Amino acid sequence: MESTLELTKIKEVLQKNLKILIILPLLFLIISAIVTFFVLSPKYQANTQILVNQTKGDNPQFMAQEVQSNIQLVNTYKEIVKSPRILDEVSKDLNNKYSPSKLSSMLTITNQENTQLINIQVKSGHKQDSEKIANSFAKVTSKQIPKIMSLDNVSILSKADGTAVKVAPKTVVNLIGAFFLGLVVALIYIFFKVIFDKRIKDEEDVEKELGLPVLGSIQKFN
């Protein structure tokens, strides 16, 4: 019975503040839409892969050892891809359109565990640039590693052509997140309003807050 009364009271409070519950989420939604579509710059990500591959051989035992050795080299090669030497060469390959430090901030290097694959991911504000830069990293790396490591065991597995996708801003996530944030803010506002606003506004408040019957009311005259 007590819980039913509490639920009824909550329902009444929400109904009284229905405008706030509608206006604040919509306001947050509109602000998020403006920021997402007109303020934030789009980001595109392109991906390419290079393979640390074994040398040719007929001995299965030798080939297995070579594969294991190449897997162990992957971490070293990942660091080489991010090194100043590679960044400088990529910058030159792109006619110095991007500085080495800028290229470094656009670059992400990953690899799947226990594989010989290195994934090169590049984020840029332009779709074509993302693909072009990713391809440049793959090309430069495959040329420079034999000079650095004295091992010619790197090849380009897949180019970035046609792989660029928009990764930011996340329109749906931003809009839904803003709507629910507005809803939470509205509920918090209503909660504090109920807690701290003790003003009596109508006959119903007199009966509830003071426990006194209302005998009559005075009309408001202009």
UniProtKB/Swiss-Prot annotation:
GO terms for cellular component: plasma membrane. Keywords: Capsule biogenesis/degradation, Cell membrane, Exopolysaccharide synthesis, Membrane, Transmembrane, Transmembrane helix, Virulence. The chain crosses the membrane at residues 20-40, 172-192. One of its GO terms (biological process) is polysaccharide biosynthetic process. Coiled coil: none annotated. It is found in: Cell membrane. It is a multi-pass membrane protein. Required for the biosynthesis of type 8 capsular polysaccharide (Cap8/CP8). Might act as the chain-length regulator. Belongs to the CpsC/CapA family. PANTHER family: FERRIC ENTEROBACTIN TRANSPORT PROTEIN FEPE (PTHR32309:SF13), TYROSINE-PROTEIN KINASE (PTHR32309). This is Capsular polysaccharide type 8 biosynthesis protein cap8A. The lineage of its organism: Bacteria, Bacillati, Bacillota, Bacilli, Bacillales. The gene is cap8A.
